[in-house]
């Protein structure tokens, strides 16, 4: 099932990567800040790259951050 919010995404990443929820949630929030910068620049490609490189997830998850 696809996560619907940042908390569910963090839980998925914590489980996948074997890290604590807190660590995963902090990473998700850092990525959210990076994505905000990409959105302000109008760069969807940059946003997609951030998701792939920082979280190892596909652009399908971008909706969680909008």
Regions found by a protein language model. Give the residues of each.
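Long, compositionally biased
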Residues: 35-66
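Short linear loop/turn motifs
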Residues: 23-35, 65-66
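Leucine-/aliphatic-rich long alpha-helical segments
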Residues: 10-16, 31, 35, 48-51
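N-terminal acidic leader/helix
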Residues: 1-26
């Amino acid at each position: 099932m696809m996560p619907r919010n940042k908390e569910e995404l963090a839980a998925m990443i914590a489980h996948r990567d074997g890290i604590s929820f807190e660590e995963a949630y902090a990473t998700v929030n850092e990525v959210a800040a990076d994505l905000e910068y990409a959105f302000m620049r109008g760069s969807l490609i940059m946003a997609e790259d951030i998701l792939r490189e920082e979280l190892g997830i596909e652009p399908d998850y971008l909706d969680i951050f909008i």
